[in-house]
């Protein structure tokens, strides 16, 4: 929740609260999914442990080679994909260092209800004067980064790929999918391409 209020009369949880200084805009076809957990346990240590399980749940995975040998995902290579060294460097930079996806999320403080999980399209600053940076724009999964992250997770077993893919998937499901049957058939249920490029 983004707001909590408590008094003698009860507890109020704000998911899109009025205390926010602006509007919460949901465009046609968008969803906003929230989960709220209540724990009324007087044992603070037990409650903390239970919440840890919610925030970082156990997940069962296989050795990366099992996925490729199963052929459940067509053309999934075995091992590390046989990548050239140049590609390995790019993939490593996606996870570590100042230009990693994690660092970019921190740089623009991308933790809001609408865009958390989406990736900053920082390449759109290319023609922008320094005084107008950062230009906040998003990929909206237009190049299927989600698929790439999930494939890297399966190939490497590196949980950081999952830590990026999971919130991106949740963002795509709520914001980037056009949840309607009232538009043209070609658009209904498809991806909502709503990025304006190269301007702030």
Task: Please identify what each model-predicted range represents.
Residues 1-200:
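Catalytic cores of extracellular degradative/oxidative enzymes
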């Amino acid at each position: 929740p983004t707001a909590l209020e408590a008094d003698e009369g009860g507890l109020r949880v704000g998911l899109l609260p009025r205390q926010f200084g602006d509007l919460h805009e949901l465009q046609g076809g968008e969803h906003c999914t929230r989960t709220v957990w209540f724990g009324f346990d007087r044992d603070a240590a037990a409650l903390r442990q239970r919440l840890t399980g919610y925030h970082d749940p156990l997940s069962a995975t296989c050795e990366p080679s099992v996925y490729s040998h199963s052929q459940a995902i067509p053309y999934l290579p075995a091992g590390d994909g046989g990548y050239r060294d140049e590609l390995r460097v790019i993939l490593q930079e996606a996870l570590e260092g100042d230009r990693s996806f994690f660092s970019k999320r921190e740089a623009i403080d991308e933790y809001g209800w609408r865009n958390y999980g989406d990736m900053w399209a920082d390449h759109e600053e290319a023609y922008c004067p320094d005084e107008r940076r950062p230009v906040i724009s998003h990929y909206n999964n237009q190049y299927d980064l989600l698929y790439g992250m999930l494939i890297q997770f399966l190939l490497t077993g590196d949980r950081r790929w999952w830590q990026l893919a999971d919130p991106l998937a949740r963002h795509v499901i709520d914001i980037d999918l056009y949840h309607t049957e009232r538009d043209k058939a070609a658009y209904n249920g498809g991806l909502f391409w709503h990025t304006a490029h190269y301007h702030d």
